[in-house]
Amino acid sequence: RDSFYNKHNLTPFLDSLMSHSLIFNNTYSNGLRSIEALPAITASIPTLSNTPFISSVYAQNKFNSLASILSEDGYSTSFFHGGTRGTMGFYSFCKKAGFQSYYGLEEYNDNKDYDGTWGIYDEPFFKFFAKKLKEEKKPFFSTFFSLSAHPPYSIPIKHKNKFKDGELDIHK
């Protein structure tokens, strides 16, 4: 396998890691939508019903997550998402899952980077994320949930017409 994105070499750094990594070619998705990803990835809770776990009555149950387990081992834990606190129930889930810190649009506090729909554009929010990680003083676990994979796929003006259009709306 030459790249993560089939015949297109769009992720050269990640591709360079493949020869030094354990790669799983056959995997199973534990959800179909973004709202289902956070519980699946951080707490091993797959989507088993038509209602995402975060929105279900089961979200009130006690459960362990990477954040809660690592917190017990002395790690600081944080979650970053450029949207508002109420978006997709992430803030409530993160508190219940044991994340010590939550950073979103309100914590970023600079509306000039707002995409007009979801929250802060990914590029400036990734820079904010990197700055916060550099401030960590002890072992840490952090999760970043980006906004760019959601319609209407807003692109900052400085990046318009910079890339060739692809086959899907997200590639335009």
Where on the chain are the PLM-derived regions?
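Solvent-exposed soluble domains appended to multi-pass membrane proteins
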Residues: 1-172
